[in-house]
Amino acid sequence: MLVTTSRKPSAKSRTLCKLLSRFTASRCISRGKMGMQELLDFTEGNTFIVVGEYHGNPGELSFHDNEGKLLFSIRFSDRYSEEIDSYWFPDVLPVLTGEGEIAEALESFFHFERVESDRVVQLPQNSLVMAIGDKEIDFMGSGKSLFKFNIKGFKKY
């Protein structure tokens, strides 16, 4: 899987692209002037996420299949914890927890293991957890919130 930016990304969008790629064990590229066909060639038949912007800040994630078809998008505002600067991402795949349409869409896209919310505390200390609700997505590492998306909108295509 690949995480990439919009065509002329801000520094904040590049930072989010890197964070998402490390959290999901994916590759990250700054797209630059790369068109959609070049991007599809670069993904080598894998799915990809495009980090879009709103007023110079990351504000939308567009989830595409291996043929470039837009599957769904999430509009959001983001918040980062102070822990993120010193956090070392372990070499493990995250697990998902949560219910609802957004959780279902993310599970089908990422294919990460899904756990019940009451089992999250039983996971190993170095686990990465994507806790998905109707209004926010919390990206947690080692039991602490690293960054969050406040969801502004969700659309399936």
UniProtKB/Swiss-Prot annotation:
GO terms for molecular function: rRNA binding. InterPro entries: Brix, Brix_dom_Rbsml_bgen_prot. SMART domains: Brix. Gene3D superfamilies: Probable brix-domain ribosomal biogenesis protein. It comes from the Archaea. Keywords: Ribosome biogenesis. Residues 1-157 form the Brix domain. One of its GO terms (biological process) is rRNA processing. NCBIfam families: PRK00933.1-3. Probably involved in the biogenesis of the ribosome. This is Probable Brix domain-containing ribosomal biogenesis protein.
